[in-house]
Curated annotation (Swiss-Prot):
InterPro entries: Bactericidal_perm-incr_a/b_dom, BPI_fold-BPI/LBP, Lipid-bd_serum_glycop_C, Lipid-bd_serum_glycop_N
Pfam families, sorted: LBP_BPI_CETP, LBP_BPI_CETP_C
Span of the signal peptide: 1-18
Lineage, broadest ranks: Eukaryota, Metazoa, Chordata, Craniata, Vertebrata
Originating species: Homo sapiens (Human)
Tissue: Detected at very low levels in normal tonsils, and at higher levels in hypertrophic tonsils.
Cell location: Secreted
Principal subcellular localisation of the protein: secreted
Name of protein: BPI fold-containing family B member 6
CC annotations in GO: extracellular region
Length: 453
């Protein structure tokens, strides 16, 4: 019984993927989006407008009536990472509090203050999305000026100001912090939505666990879900080595790391789109695609077809495409069959001449367009060529190496590049503009150095 339990446990462990399929590191450059969120939401001004309205259940402030808040200064936000927690936030701002004082005259208090809070970064259990939650909000008075008469007893003035401000400001400012975080959290909303890869399937960036915070950055580990249109999930291959960020990037900067295994899984969605049936006789710089041209490389073709016939070529990718990466260079490996047919008269089906198995590599260049990862390829080299069947007898397929190489370059690779124009989706978070990113091919991964512009 114990042995059965052990076997069951081992099978569960081996079936669980613990390694992330993509990594996102957010430095302070990106997290300063909190500043823009406060600017965009105009939350302080809105809170100030609400301050003068009677709120249900709120007791009037003793000694002041007709309370209003105006002249709210543009806030300056300072952020610091708190390891294991999230972000410590300090908002420096100023405003003017007006009203009727207990002495009967108009009162004006000019306040400079700091609002501090810890924004804990969590993973929402229901949505699986990152979420900021504020805690420990405090309002610290930096400077206070008032138009109250100078002949009043200082202790009385200070006591009144202290009582008034500590009643008004926390209720005004701390909800502003929460409201800004709600605004920021909305910018995570689309992160785990399925995004299309053409019409062949979708990619979804699923957060594996709560984001990890260090003294320099926040890291998010993703387990991307690559799913075919019919619902079948494509598993990421085992990378063999743990996915880690390379050294040498500026402190406080932000990067996205996409491993070659993940890109391979995405391209597997497009495998059938790489199948082609080419019937054109004239293609680019190639000689006419006829049996006469083919006979220059295989004399047996001239014997079987004394009169020249048009050729049709069918290429099918037999294994899922595989992306590999070494520093500075990325290759796309394609294992295919290439079958050539000769046309026949009277609407008869073309006759198969031969079937080859072809393994070749394409060099890959990466770019970003409209927030999609783009790939453009060119032939690296033809790796192997083997004959599987032939209707024209035995021949030395190596004699076709130059012919097939030119054919791939002129006829097939343009088809591959057309298919790749669908683009590969990138994580949708904080309204990130990937078009500004700098791309680097590192060991086993593609690095996007994110920029705000």
């Amino acid at each position: 019984m114990l042995r059965i339990l052990c076997l069951a446990l081992c099978s569960l462990l081996t079936g669980t993927r613990a390694d992330p399929g993509a990594l996102l590191r957010l430095g302070m450059d990106i997290m300063n989006q909190v500043q823009s969120a406060m600017d965009e939401s105009h939350i302080l001004e809105k809170m100030a407008a609400e301050a003068g309205k009677k709120q249900p259940g709120m007791k009037p402030i003793k000694g002041i009536t007709n309370l209003k808040v105006k002249d709210v200064q543009l806030p300056v936000i300072t952020l610091n990472f708190v390891p294991g927690v999230g972000i410590f936030q300090c908002v420096s701002t100023g405003m003017t509090v007006t009203g009727k004082s207990f002495m009967g005259g108009n009162m004006e208090i000019i306040v400079a203050l700091n609002i501090t809070a810890t924004n804990r970064l969590l993973r929402d259990e229901e949505t699986g999305l990152p979420v900021f939650k504020s805690e420990g909000c405090e309002v610290i008075l930096v400077n206070v000026k008032t138009n109250l008469p100078s002949n009043m007893l200082p202790k009385m003035v200070n006591k009144f100001l202290d009582s008034t401000l500590h009643k008004v400001l926390p209720g005004l400012m701390c909800p502003a912090i929460d409201a800004v975080l709600v605004y920021v959290n909305r910018k995570w909303t689309n992160l785990s939505d399925p995004m299309p890869v053409g019409q062949m399937g979708t990619v979804k960036y699923v957060l594996m666990s709560a984001p990890a915070t260090t003294a320099s950055y926040i890291q998010l580990d993703f387990s991307p879900v690559v799913q075919q249109q019919k619902g079948k999930t494509i598993k990421l291959a085992d990378a063999g080595e743990a996915l880690t960020f390379p050294e040498g990037y500026a402190k406080g900067s932000s990067q996205l790391l996409l491993p070659a295994t993940f890109l391979s899984a995405e391209l597997a969605l497009l495998q059938k789109s790489f199948h082609v049936n080419i019937q054109d006789t004239m293609i680019g710089e190639l000689p006419p695609q006829t049996t006469k041209t083919l006979a220059r490389f295989i004399p047996e073709v001239a014997v079987a077809y004394p009169k020249s016939k048009p050729l049709t070529t069918q290429i099918k990718i037999k294994k899922p495409p595989k992306v590999t990466m070494k520093t500075g260079k990325s290759l796309l490996h394609l294992h295919s069959t290439l079958e050539m047919f000769a046309a026949r008269w009277r609407s008869k089906a073309p006759m198969s001449l031969f079937l080859l198995e072809v393994h070749f590599n394409l060099k890959v260049q990466y770019s970003v367009h409209e927030n999609q990862l783009q790939m453009a390829t060119s032939l690296d080299r033809l790796l192997s060529l083997s004959r599987k069947s032939s209707s024209i007898g035995n021949f030395n397929e190596r004699e076709l190496t130059g012919f097939i190489t030119s054919y791939l370059e002129e006829a097939y690779i343009p088809v591959v590049n057309d298919v790749l124009q669908v683009g590969l989706p990138l994580p949708d978070f904080l309204a990130m503009n990937y078009n500004l990113a700098e791309l680097d091919i590192v060991e086993n991964a593609l690095m996007l150095d994110l920029k705000l512009g």
